[in-house]
Structure formats: structure tokens, C-alpha cells
Amino acid sequence: MRRRKFLSGSPNHIYQRSQNGSVIFYSLEDCLVYFTVFCTCAKRYGVTVLGLCEMYDHIHQLVEAPDLPTLSGFERMVNMTFSYEYYGDLKRGAEGFVSDRNITSGSVSVTIPNIGHLFQSPFGSAPKIGNKKIRTSIAYLYNNPVERNIHQEAIKWRWNFLAYAFS
């Protein structure tokens, strides 16, 4: 396995894809649970969050961690805790344990298989060195919903938290 690049004191662009390109966030609750787990783990691990964007099938983060073991531990805990909650919700269906669950969101009905890992492993990361690369990474992270044609305005996409960012 390749050694992960890391530079202490520099922001790292972290990207985490779903297994097989499947949807991660089906509901408002899924997004809020991930955000809660992410924020709780960031505080616990002493990770500074510069940006977060939850997409339907992947996640982008821009974070600063004091060292590589802290960053890896943080990502492991976020993914493990969210996966536990995600699959726990699937298993706590109306009939107890179910092998799959039909989730209805508005007029769209989707069946979620309850097999395997939720996220691809390992997570991807790229340290950002220098103001230009940091700014470019922030713009990429927050503009991802526009580039993927999910929303017309980045600031109005509720799951990139751009409306709550400050300079």
C-alpha cells in the first residue's frame, strides 16, 4: 500500500466515496447524523474543520490535524460510527432485522441493500500547501454541488455548510 502524504500544520483535502458508487445520504436524518458524528469526532480528536461537503454518494472535507495518526484515527472513527448508525437504522426496521429496507423520500422510493462496507477504503487525502492551493481546494469543495449539477448556487446547497462559513 502506498504511504499516505501528510504535512503537519497543512490542511488536507479528504475525500471518501461510497462503496460501488451507491447513495450514502437518503434523508435529512442521514445528513444530520453524519454532520453530528463528524463534529463530535473533530472535537474529540482536536481536528480543525475548514470545510465539509456532503454529496449523495461521497464526502469532501478540508481539515487540519496535528499528525497523521490523529487524522487516520479521526477518519476511522467518523466512518465507523456513521456506518454503525447507518446500518443500525437499516437493521431496526419495522420487522426487526431486515436484509433490505425501502426508504421513501418524497415521491422517490429506493431500496437499500444491507451488505458490505458503506465506504470505500482507504479514504483519499491530499495535503494542500500554500495559499493558492488552499483557496483552490476550498472553492472546489464548496462548489462541488454546482459542478455535479445538483444545485445552481453553492451557497444554497444545505450540505456544504457554506452559508455558515466565515472568513
Predicted regions span which residues?
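Short catalytic/metal-binding and nucleic-acid-binding patches
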Residues: 1-167
